[in-house]
Swiss-Prot record:
N6-acetyllysine carried by residues: 27-28
Gene: H2B-3
Keyword Membrane set for record: no
Broad class of the protein's primary localization: nucleus
UniProt tissue specificity: Ubiquitous. Highest level in shoots, fruits and young flower buds, including petals, anthers and ovules.
Ranges of Basic and acidic residues composition bias in the record: 1-37
InterPro entries assigned to the protein according to its UniProt record, in alphabetical order: Histone-fold, Histone_H2A/H2B/H3, Histone_H2B, HISTONE_H2B_site
Protein name, UniProt field: Histone H2B.3
Physiological role: Core component of nucleosome. Nucleosomes wrap and compact DNA into chromatin, limiting DNA accessibility to the cellular machineries which require DNA as a template. Histones thereby play a central role in transcription regulation, DNA repair, DNA replication and chromosomal stability. DNA accessibility is regulated via a complex set of post-translational modifications of histones, also called histone code, and nucleosome remodeling.
Length: 137
């Protein structure tokens, strides 16, 4: 029976060693999966973010200040949320007025409804300026 106990003790040790090696094997799996993707020639869809634009605005406002990647992620989520709210409101306005198209007028009204007070006024003026610049060029 002592001989039976010793192999029983060794098996947990043997089980622990592969358990430690599993994360390494796990790291190798994505490489194998990536190789599989290369064989299929499936291109990865580019994730669209506003990070470069947020950074450009930050440098215009505060050239000496940086931003962490976590804060950048939060800002990107914030922009996505605001745009989603504006799109939903503009869509609702177009539906109410039985219009098939969302125009700059619907966007402007959505901005006035979604954004509070002074922020809405500034957003409308900047939006009007951008549309004028776009149509003139």
């Amino acid at each position: 029976k002592p001989a039976e106990k010793k192999p029983a003790e060794k098996t947990p040790v043997a089980e622990k060693a592969p358990a430690e090696k599993k994360p390494k094997a796990g790291k190798k799996l994505p490489k194998d999966a990536a190789a599989g993707d290369k064989k299929k020639k499936r291109s990865k869809k580019a994730v669209e973010t506003y990070k470069i634009y947020i950074f450009k605005v930050l440098k215009q406002v505060h050239p000496d200040i940086g931003i962490s990647s976590k804060a950048m992620g939060i800002m990107n989520s914030f922009i996505n949320d605001i745009f989603e709210k504006l799109a939903q409101e503009a869509s609702r306005l177009a539906r109410y007025n039985k219009k098939p198209t969302i125009t700059s007028r619907e966007i402007q009204t959505a901005v006035r409804l979604v954004l509070p007070g002074e922020l809405a006024k500034h957003a409308v003026s900047e939006g009007t300026k951008a549309v004028t610049k776009f149509t003139s060029s």
